[in-house]
Amino acid sequence: MPCTTILVGKNASYDGSTLVARNEDSSNGVFEPKRMRVVHPDEQPRVYTSVLSHLTVELPDNPMRYTSVPDVVPGHGIWAEAGFNELNVGMSATETLTTNERVRGADPLVDYVPAKGNEGEDGYVPAQPGGLGEEDMVTLVLPYAKSARDGVRILGDLLERYGTYENNGIAFSDVDEIWWLETIGGHHWIAKRVPDDAYVTMPNQLGIDSFDLDDAEGAQADHMCSADLRAWMAEWHLDLTLGVEGDGPAAVFNPREAFGSHSDSDHVYNTPRAWYMQRCLNPSDVWDGPDADYTPESDDIPWSRVPERKVTIEDIKYVLSSHYQGTEYDCYGSKGTPATRGAYRPIGINRNSQLAVLQLRPYAQPAYRAVQWMAFGSNSFNALVPLYANVETMPEYYADTQARVTSENFYWANRLIGALADVRFHECGRAVEDYQEKVGGMGHKQIHDIDAAVAVLPEAEVPAELARANEEFAERVRVETDALLGKVLY
């Protein structure tokens, strides 16, 4: 999916949490209704078959309960997207990435091949299943991962065994670490730990720009990779580091150069998004003019950076809702020209389906540590709401999305608000901002108050109280969302 991701290490976040956030965007001309769901062990398949690639995978018998944000309309797969399991391991999948012709030749993607002819007749060729894709990954990995590193290993093993039919980036988190995995061709992959004091910005482009093969093949302190990556790179001459001998890659190399792309479309669709996110979080750098450190079309914008100050939930929401505010590229702005205002793909667009921010708080007890902040619809007009993840059910307002358009659930109410406010952006702006600030403030107070309330409860009683708190807060959000819908309608 055409998404945008930001990852924030624990020492770079405002409260010591690991933070994983990603927009899921629908493709042009298509909208996929979304809902919240808790998947229980008895609901997890033991034999899984992908709808798109027809791949069948046998799964372990010991899945954990986990949260997810699946598609509503049946027929093309689950697309669980983001969530936490019972051990407070988070996963967000996927960020669709780009690659290049050398990689596709060296390790072709594993596409589904339909059957030819009729079974039982001469010349019949049976269908060949494809590999894994975004449709599958959360369902196949999150119920079994015991840590962020373990999630990387599980998915890495699946990729090496079954392959993939698309290029993807996947985030895993626990209370101590965030790992980012990028698929390389059909069966190869690399993963890097997000530095604790840094954030990572990811548009739809292969991002990791420095990788230590020795660490990945040894201690794996900060890097992991597919088993034969070094030999495969050497065979296909994929490392582009100057001065490296032709028979092998450098111990430390740049994967973005080796495996990624620098196409003209990247400079419209991808690099501008990374440029603007980092502009917001490191504003003292030079971002404009002939002496700019980076421009919207720079190919060397860093994968990770230390921010100028600690990053908040609101910072994440702002950058993942952004449309180049304050620049000549703002599609809602008055600076520049019509050409500049339409030059680059914004992050906050009408095709945003959902935004999940996965927060793991080290100061909270494990029973209520995981908070999944959620927003639906266009991020320029919606608000994040917090949900405790250690629960058996989700509030109906978030979970009961149907294909039918209605104002009675959070997804469609936000879609309606976005459609109405988009064409009257400036007239509706004040009402939208008031709603976002009020709901955000309500959310932070809710978490503070419920943390205190459940801290004195026996652990066995905590999930039920968290579910009750989620439900009560959802009703308050419903009131505020209905009020905003009325304001933008009039």
Where in this protein do the model-derived segments appear?
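A contiguous strand-loop segment
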Residues: 2-134, 154-293
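Short Pro/Gly-enriched beta-strand edge/turn motifs at strand-loop
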Residues: 60-66, 152, 334-342
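Short, well-ordered beta-strand elements within core beta-sheets of diverse protein domains
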Residues: 138-144
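Short, charged, surface-exposed loops that flank catalytic or proteolytic processing sites
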Residues: 144-150
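Short, well-structured alpha-helical segments that form the helix of a local strand-helix-strand
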Residues: 151-160, 316-320
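Glycine-rich, aromatic-lined ligand/substrate-binding cores of catalytic
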Residues: 231-363
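Substrate-recognition/cap regions that form aromatic- and gly/pro-loop-enriched pockets
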Residues: 324-325, 329-454
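Histidine-centered catalytic/metal-binding microenvironments
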Residues: 432-490
